[in-house]
């Protein structure tokens, strides 16, 4: 659906508590041309308590980031409620309905995908992978989560490297954020 990026979020339960990490590559393409290799597609929101990443049209994603952060502020950082309220707006607002982007969002309690159709999805295994390299990153993250003791951040790093080796729209310049 979206070319030009891979976003991956992993949550891991450890004896010390829940680890949550999100990462993305930095490649931006315009058709078949790489126009930027160091874009920052993941960030912390709501006073550093929520992680978010986007795949899709950049301007559309920034619009969603702004609206999602406003919902987080309005609902005191409650991730699920903010996501649902954003998707309600998404489905009823004529401008939002035309936005071509997906968001991956996570806090200490939940990880969610907010789709371009206005859906909110919570993955069962705590792994979110979106964008053109998402399937590669998802498979790598599942294997690493199930068969290693790597931290969530290290799983994100390794899985993004694997996706970057396989997906022509994903590069090796990664930004990784953790909670």
From Swiss-Prot:
Localization per Swiss-Prot or TrEMBL: Cytoplasm
Residues forming the catalytic site: 5
Keywords: Allosteric enzyme, Cytoplasm, Hydrolase, Metal-binding, Protease, Sodium, Threonine protease
GO cellular component: HslUV protease complex; proteasome core complex
EC numbers: 3.4.25.2
Enzyme class, first EC level, given as a word: hydrolase
GO biological process: proteolysis involved in protein catabolic process
Binding site for Na(+): 164, 167, 170
Record carries keyword Repeat: no
PROSITE patterns reported for this sequence: PROTEASOME_BETA_2
Signal peptide: none
Superkingdom of this protein's organism: Bacteria
Reaction(s) the record says it catalyses: ATP-dependent cleavage of peptide bonds with broad specificity
InterPro entries: ATP-dep_Prtase_HsIV_su (IPR022281), Ntn_hydrolases_N (IPR029055), Proteasome_sua/b (IPR001353), Proteasome_suB-type (IPR023333)
Activity regulation field: Allosterically activated by HslU binding.
Any coiled-coil regions, as ranges: none
Pfam families assigned to the protein according to its UniProt record, in alphabetical order: Proteasome (PF00227)
GO molecular function annotation: metal ion binding; threonine-type endopeptidase activity
PANTHER family: ATP-DEPENDENT PROTEASE SUBUNIT HSLV (PTHR32194:SF0), METALLOPROTEASE TLDD (PTHR32194)
Subunit structure: A double ring-shaped homohexamer of HslV is capped on each side by a ring-shaped HslU homohexamer. The assembly of the HslU/HslV complex is dependent on binding of ATP.
Function description: Protease subunit of a proteasome-like degradation complex believed to be a general protein degrading machinery.
Similarity-based family: Belongs to the peptidase T1B family. HslV subfamily.
Name recorded for this polypeptide: ATP-dependent protease subunit HslV
């Amino acid at each position: 659906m979206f070319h030009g990026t891979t976003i991956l979020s992993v949550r891991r339960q450890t004896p010390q508590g829940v680890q949550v990490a999100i990462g993305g590559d930095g490649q931006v393409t315009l058709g078949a041309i790489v126009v930027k290799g160091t874009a920052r597609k993941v960030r912390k929101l709501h006073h550093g308590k929520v992680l978010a990443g986007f795949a899709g049209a950049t301007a559309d994603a920034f619009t969603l980031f702004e609206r999602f952060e406003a919902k987080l502020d309005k609902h005191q950082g409650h991730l699920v409620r903010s996501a649902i309220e954003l998707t309600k707006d998404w489905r009823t607002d004529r401008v939002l309905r035309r936005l071509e982007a997906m968001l991956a969002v996570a806090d200490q309690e939940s990880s969610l995908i907010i789709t371009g159709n206005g859906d909110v999805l919570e993955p069962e295994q705590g792994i979110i992978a979106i964008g053109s390299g998402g399937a590669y990153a998802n498979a790598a993250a599942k294997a690493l989560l199930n068969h290693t003791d790597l931290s969530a951040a290290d799983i994100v790093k390794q899985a993004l490297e694997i996706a970057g080796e396989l997906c022509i729209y994903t590069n090796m310049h990664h930004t990784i954020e953790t909670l």
